[in-house]
Amino acid sequence: MNISDVISFDILVSAMKTGNQSFGTDFLLVGLFQYGWINSLLFVVIATLFTVALTGNIMLIHLIRLNTRLHTPMYFLLSQLSIVDLMYISTTVPKMAVSFLSQSKTIRFLGCEIQTYVFLALGGTEALLLGFMSYDRYVAICHPLHYPMLMSKKICCLMVACAWASGSINAFIHTLYVFQLPFCRSRLINHFFCEVPALLSLVCQDTSQYEYTVLLSGLIILLLPFLAILASYARVLIVVFQMSSGKGQAKAVSTCSSHLIVASLFYATTLFTYTRPHSLRSPSRDKAVAVFYTIVTPLLNPFIYSLRNKEVTGAVRRLLGYWICCRKYDFRSLY
């Protein structure tokens, strides 16, 4: 018996001692944290990252909405990405925090189903949005004369609608199928949220055929956009190196590399989770990998896609200057 089994058994016994009568239909989440000062410190770190991610995404959304200079296709797609990230990180971290603070690991069947659906829908939407954003940069740099036509408001709205619809439909199909399966083993989910691979380990019938469906979905929704991103940025770099000076080339390489690092972090970790066979899974490793696409990427996206942009940083400075002036005026009015 390994340490993961011991922890799971302890949580199971603890839940039974609390007299939870709904244990037969509810699930129990092992969680990311156990109890102790090290895990309490880790909880504080995660809570801080969550707060920073919320603040960064909310600020970027409002900044794009309020500043008319940022009402362009690129920033429209970026605002949609921030909305997705805002909802994405809020799907898992608050429940994880409540479970840790209240020492209650229970999640109701319906709550688990809703969390699975929302998480899958937002993950699929983000994967497609990142692909569309790379296409926007490709058109802007490689086909600037055709940019107004290829990235019109109508096309941008169609891209966003396609991303949301595809992510939602994919999530609905998988959630509907998984939660009609017989969970005839322990209701203990060795994860910090309800995720399809973790749920499949509780199913008593053979799920190998369905796992091929998960693999196919992962290749379509995750791998294809990632390949499109790689191709787009490769073409962008080729064009930049043919046309720009050394300074422009260095800036393009720096920008593209930062975008690629964040995108690669998201796609690599999600592909690692959703395209591996069940026999190669490790609950502890799966939880560690999940932290990257549930917490780290929503934290990094607003900063990576905006801090290197002069228009966004300029808008932030103007907004802060306006806020400081207003605060000074309000302070002086008291006297």
UniProtKB/Swiss-Prot annotation:
Keywords assigned: Cell membrane, Disulfide bond, G-protein coupled receptor, Glycoprotein, Membrane, Olfaction, Receptor, Sensory transduction, Transducer, Transmembrane, Transmembrane helix
Location in the cell: Cell membrane
Entry's Gene Ontology cellular component terms: plasma membrane
Record flagged with keyword Glycoprotein: yes
GO biological process: detection of chemical stimulus involved in sensory perception of smell
Topology in the lipid bilayer: Multi-pass membrane protein
Pfam families in alphabetical order: 7tm_4
Gene3D superfamilies (UniProt xref): Rhodopsin 7-helix transmembrane proteins
Disulfide pattern: C112-C204
GO molecular function: G protein-coupled receptor activity; olfactory receptor activity
Extracellular side: 1-40, 95-115, 174-210, 275-287
Transmembrane portions of the chain: 41-64, 73-94, 116-135, 155-173, 211-234, 252-274, 288-307
UniProt cross-references to InterPro entries, sorted A to Z: GPCR_Rhodpsn, GPCR_Rhodpsn_7TM, Olfact_rcpt
Major localization class: membrane
UniProt keyword annotation of Membrane present: yes
Known glycosylation sites: N20
Residue ranges that the UniProt entry lists as topological domain Cytoplasmic: 65-72, 136-154, 235-251, 308-335
Family: Belongs to the G-protein coupled receptor 1 family.
Role noted for this protein: Odorant receptor.
Protein name: Olfactory receptor 2AK2
